[in-house]
Structures are given as structure tokens and as C-alpha cells.
């Protein structure tokens, strides 16, 4: 079994909102990262979290406009998915699509597959 910590958007109850905070929490512990793309985008920290990609166990995929955690379909917000996926070169784990409904999930799946092809 592999345990992972998820990066979270800024809130009074979040521990791991920055790459540095997440790295410090994991220091010396055999634990992975559940990388949430949308959460990182709300903090403007996608590139910083990509520096920790060797510890990614899975990736939560959704888009937003950069201010709040909207769970928009892939390609409908401000996440630069081609750049993100380029930064994930060599990643072989799971992508978990997060959406507000089935139609949005299917749309995200199609777009993600297109980008990964």
C-alpha cells in the first residue's frame, strides 16, 4: 500500500499548500504525493510542484481559472496542459479526472487522451 499527501489550495485548514511545505511534511517519511493540478494552479505553483514529480503517486486532473478550485473540464481554464504534460515526462502513474459531472469527465478524458497521444 502506498500512502500519499495531496497538495491543497490555500485555506485555514490546509497543511500542504506549497511545494516547500509538502516537501517538509514528507521529509524522512516513505510517502508519496497526490498531485492536484487544479489546486496547484490556484496557487500559481504548478512548476514548483513538478520539481517533486519523482514522488507523484497519482495526479488529480481538472482545470480552473486560477483563483478558485472550480473543477472545470481540461482545456476550459488557465492550466497550460501541454506544458504541464511536458513537465511530467517519464511519469507512469495514474491520472484521476475530477469533474462536476459525467459529461465534463468524458470531455476531460477525451482532451487528456488527445494531449497525451
Report residues per predicted region.
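Aromatic-lined carbohydrate-recognition surfaces of secreted/lumenal glycan-active proteins
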Residues: 1-13, 35-38
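Histidine-acidic metal/acid-base catalytic patches
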Residues: 15-34, 40-117
Amino acid at each position: 500500500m502506498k500512502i500519499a499527501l495531496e497538495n491543497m489550495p490555500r485555506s485555514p485548514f490546509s497543511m500542504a499548500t506549497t511545494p516547500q511545505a509538502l516537501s517538509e511534511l514528507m521529509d524522512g517519511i516513505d510517502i508519496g504525493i497526490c498531485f492536484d493540478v487544479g489546486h496547484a494552479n490556484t496557487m500559481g505553483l504548478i512548476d514548483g510542484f513538478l520539481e517533486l514529480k519523482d514522488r507523484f503517486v497519482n495526479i488529480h486532473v481538472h482545470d480552473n481559472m486560477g483563483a478558485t478550485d472550480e473543477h472545470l473540464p481540461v482545456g476550459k481554464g488557465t492550466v497550460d496542459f501541454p506544458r504541464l504534460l511536458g513537465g511530467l515526462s517519464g511519469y507512469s502513474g495514474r491520472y484521476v479526472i475530477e469533474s462536476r459531472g459525467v459529461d465534463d469527465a468524458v470531455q476531460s478524458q477525451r482532451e487528456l487522451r488527445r494531449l497525451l497521444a
